[in-house]
Design a protein with these regions (language model features):
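Transmembrane-helix signature of polytopic, membrane-embedded enzymes
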Residues: 109-126, 154, 158, 275-278
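Extracytoplasmic catalytic-loop and juxtamembrane helix elements of membrane-embedded
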Residues: 29-38, 211-241
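Perimembrane helix-loop-helix junctions
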Residues: 1, 175-202
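Short acidic/glycine- and proline-prone juxtamembrane loop motifs at membrane-interface regions
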Residues: 132-140
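Aromatic/glycine/proline-enriched transmembrane-helix motif characteristic
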Residues: 105, 230-295
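TM-lumen/periplasm interface segments of multi-pass membrane proteins
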Residues: 1-115, 227
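Specific aromatic-rich, kink-prone transmembrane helix
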Residues: 140-156
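Membrane-interface alpha helices of multi-pass inner-membrane proteins
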Residues: 127-130, 146-147, 157-181, 283-291
Length: 296
């Protein structure tokens, strides 16, 4: 039985987040107000900056392509063809906000199904309400949670396909392959892991390969930007830089500490007395990668 209180929380958080972004919506997303009021969003910014307002294909430019993987890029390209009228930027945001709320609500119910004890932790997390519409992260969160749900149901083929969708949406879900590999290894299901990985790879390539072939520079721009980015808001390294700590070699530190975190996670998962579920350890793989990353 679905709790009315839970539904109320989901709708209330969605409303609060919309309220937070409403100042920018009312002022046409102008700067510096979007930063002062903490309502900046890539959704509005990239609509015109990446020429979606003219229905331009998001990966046709080598220098101004859409800096997100294909599912987000193609999805927003399709949205741009809707008859948005004179107030197109706000309607573009509204359509995206509606989709994000749908993904948020469904993913919250999936978390409840995976483990009811933690159902409220996800929607009530301050970072969720504060940044619900800052970009399209809920698209990938939705597919990641579905990946976990079906994996722990032993429906590996569906889970592998969904992981391919998740990686083609934001790429960082590739870190799930680490705990998945260890779970299969512990269960002596090596061939099942190979099949799982092939399903994931085929779906990823289905979305990426055509664009990479015909618009390689535009497709590669997402990876190029992430490889070249410095320490940004939310990362440990940016916080340390505010303390006037010399971080000339922070890229090397980031790589070394990330590899150490991954190595420790592998040892930890292998030495566990019993095989964990993906729901129990997926978070650890994300933490191992994001804690020392240049961008959080």
């Amino acid at each position: 039985m679905v709790s009315k209180g839970f539904v109320f929380v989901l709708l209330f958080i969605s409303f609060l987040s919309l309220l937070k972004f409403n100042y920018c919506r009312a002022t046409n997303w102008a700067s510096p107000g979007n930063y002062v009021h903490a309502c900046y969003t890539d959704i509005a910014a990239l609509y015109s900056e990446r020429e979606l307002d003219t229905n331009a294909f998001p990966y046709q430019s080598a220098t101004n392509s859409f800096e997100y993987p294909p599912i987000i890029g193609l999805g927003n390209w399709l949205i741009s063809f809707l008859n948005l009228g004179n107030n197109s930027i706000n309607l573009f945001f509204d359509i995206n906000a509606f989709l994000i709320i749908i993904f948020f609500i469904i993913s919250a119910f999936l978390v409840m199904k995976i483990n009811p004890r933690y159902s409220y932790l996800y929607p009530l997390a301050p970072a969720v309400g504060a940044s619900l519409f800052i970009n399209w992260d809920l698209w990938v969160v939705f597919s990641m949670i579905l990946t976990i749900y079906y994996f722990d149901k032993k429906k590996f083929e569906i889970s592998g396909i969904l992981l391919g969708v998740a990686i083609a949406t934001k790429f960082f879900p590739v870190v799930f392959l680490l705990p998945i590999a260890i779970i299969f290894y512990r269960n002596r299901q090596v061939f099942e892991f190979i099949r799982y990985t092939l399903n994931t790879l085929l779906i990823y390539l289905a979305f990426n390969l055509p664009i990479a072939i015909f618009y390689f520079d535009g497709w590669w721009r997402f990876f190029k930007l992430n490889l070249e980015r410095g320490a940004e808001f939310g990362s440990i390294w940016y916080g340390l830089s505010l303390l006037a700590i010399n971080l000339s070699y922070f890229n090397s530190f980031s790589t070394i500490f990330t590899l150490l975190a991954i190595a420790y996670l592998i040892i930890y998962l292998i030495k566990l007395p019993s095989t964990p579920s993906l729901a129990q350890v997926a978070f650890l793989s994300v933490v191992a990668i994001t804690t020392f990353a240049r961008v959080y």
